[in-house]
Amino acid sequence: MSAAGRYLVGMALTESKDLALGTPCPDFRLRSVDGKTYARDGFREKPALVVMFICNHCPYVQAVEDRIIALAREYGPRSVQLVGICSNDPTDYPDDRPERLRARAREKRYGFPYLIDETQDVARAFGAVCTPDIYVFDRDRRLAYHGRIDDNWNDPKKVTRRELAA
């Protein structure tokens, strides 16, 4: 397992199951917080697809949220499609209820679709077990990168390496 696939969640180290580089992007078809349905193949015209497992309640996502939004603004005009997916059970995490996801996306002006994985089937297909969990797929929708956004989740002023830089 690469270090990029390891995350501290609470006080426990949680590892996402690495998809091997070159693995095809798992298929998905999910409803977004705005009521539209999006599918993996609906982004075919984009040369890259960035799938981000995120949510509202996670302090690690909250810490990098503005950087995720900046990535969407930076890469969107370059025809890179970013997609956020929340796979949490809202019964366990009330902040991740659809209406709260929608409110957060509007409040923060997410520049990407924010999808709801109600069954967690998509998260399982990706092997995503924590947030944020970032997957970058190339034009052929083969995995090119899996890991973090940068090297300091807590303090953007202390970032020395941006893994998702052009």
Q: Language-model segments: what does each one mean?
A:
Residues 5-165:
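Chalcogenol-based redox active-site neighborhoods
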